[in-house]
Curated annotation (Swiss-Prot):
Keywords: Acyltransferase, Flavonoid biosynthesis, Transferase. The active site is at C169. Its EC number is 2.3.1.74. GO terms for molecular function: naringenin-chalcone synthase activity. The keyword Acyltransferase applies. This is Chalcone synthase. It comes from Petroselinum crispum (Parsley). Pathway: Secondary metabolite biosynthesis; flavonoid biosynthesis. InterPro entries: Chalcone/stilbene_synt_C, Chalcone/stilbene_synt_N, Chalcone/stilbene_synthase_AS, Polyketide_synthase_type-III, Thiolase-like. The gene is CHS. Gene3D superfamilies: 3.40.47.10.
Length: 398
């Protein structure tokens, strides 16, 4: 009797599971319309926060902006908004309500823009979306941004939702890791992943005693990215862009408190307490060996690279430590330059940039002509997400 039941359960189990690896089937991105040029930002920032008397600090901030390798960013908060909400401009004034009122509405809205583009590229009816993962470090609410997006897009009420709040900058890797497991464990699953970030939670005036907060003001930008994932694509209508081969997460040794964020009455405060680029570059080879050893790859220049651009120093030190050729981080640096650090959304923007450039330049695959690639997320913990990707022949994607 028991055997009969076991066989039955086994059969049900097999029917429930997909056969092949998860594929990225579409990517969409969106930003607010308000564009901020980095060259003009120090003047604007010190003027709008009534801090022009802090001339030494402004010089420091100018240097941070010059060294950031960022040309422009997009920000939802405008001068008008800041004039109406002066507490958001102060360094430490109770302003959580004003910030929440904005992000609770705008985070799902920006997410909808990115998701609509991804759904359009995918070309399938949105009723086929079975799972939704929504990720943001910008504001918290109940029911969450996942619920709001379900309503905004008109997804089925039975869509299975996962809401990730307050993960931080590594979460672009986290969402892919979770989406991979969902797609591969559920036959026919189509997972919509949305990362939407709006800096209204972290924006604040300068402080002499907290230069780490100023680093955030020089780097962070707004953006949302969406991807659709599924296993066993229907090649008559779906076009795979990348395959997800494996995904790992680890906490780096001796890195407690290296990056912290705290949600307070003053908004989300950002703290950098240790040498983050040093900690990441020191440990990155271990993550690569663990991920690529089983595949027999040890030449890091043979991979295409998607790394969360926390800041230019992280990219510089990783390149140096691994002996990477300059062009390896091209897509990563391009996104940093054009958008700044958009937290969890960055790596998905970089995936989009890479597949577009690869096709434009007539490369053989979506991964700059290469077969294997790596996607890295870095953030509070220090937490590192490592995703192994395989590209798709360019002919497939047309």
């Amino acid at each position: 009797m028991a055997n009969h039941h076991n066989a039955e359960i086994e059969e049900i189990r097999n029917r429930q599971r997909a056969q092949g690896p998860a594929n990225i089937l579409a990517i969409g991105t969106a930003t607010p319309s308000n564009c901020v040029y980095q060259a003009d930002y120090p003047d604007y920032y010190f003027r709008i926060t009534n801090s022009e008397h802090m001339t030494d600090l402004k010089l420091k901030f100018k240097r941070m902006c010059e060294k950031s390798m960022i040309r422009k960013r997009y920000m939802h908060i405008t001068e008008e908004y800041l004039k109406e909400n002066p507490n958001v401009c102060a360094y430490e004034a109770p302003s959580l309500d004003a910030r929440q009122d904005l992000v609770v509405v705008e985070v799902p809205r920006l997410g909808k823009e990115a998701a609509s583009k991804a759904i359009k590229e995918w070309g399938q009816p949105k009723s086929k979306i079975t799972h939704l993962i929504f990720c943001t470090t910008s504001g918290v609410d109940m029911p969450g941004a996942d619920y709001q997006l379900t309503k905004l897009l008109g997804l089925r009420p039975s869509v299975k939702r996962f809401m990730m709040y307050q993960q931080g900058c590594f979460a672009g890797g986290t969402v892919l890791r979770l989406a991979k497991d969902l797609a591969e464990n559920n036959a026919g699953a189509r997972v919509l992943v949305v990362c939407s970030e709006i800096t209204a939670v972290t924006f604040r005036g300068p402080s002499d005693s907290h230069l780490d907060s100023l680093v955030g003001q020089a780097l962070f930008g707004d953006g949302a990215a969406a991807v659709i994932l599924g296993s066993d694509p229907d090649l008559s209508v779906e076009r795979p862009l990348f395959q997800l081969i494996s995904a790992a997460q680890t906490i780096l040794p001796d890195s407690d408190g290296a990056i912290d964020g705290h949600l307070r009455e003053v908004g989300l405060t950002f703290h950098l307490l240790k040498d983050v680029p040093g900690l990441i570059s020191k440990n990155i080879e271990k993550s690569l060996k663990e991920a690529f050893g089983p595949i027999g790859i040890s030449d890091w220049n043979s991979l295409f690279w998607i790394a969360h651009p926390g800041g230019p120093a992280i990219l510089d030190q990783v390149e140096l430590k691994l002996g990477l050729k300059e062009e390896k981080m091209r897509a990563t640096r391009q996104v940093l330059s054009d958008y700044g650090n958009m937290s969890s959304a960055c790596v998905l923007f970089i995936l989009d940039e890479m597949r577009k450039k690869s096709i434009e330049e007539g490369k053989a695959t979506t991964g700059e002509g290469l077969d294997w690639g790596v996607l890295f997320g870095f953030g509070p913990g220090l937490t590192v997400e490592t995703v192994v990707l395989h590209s798709v022949p360019a002919t497939f994607t047309h």
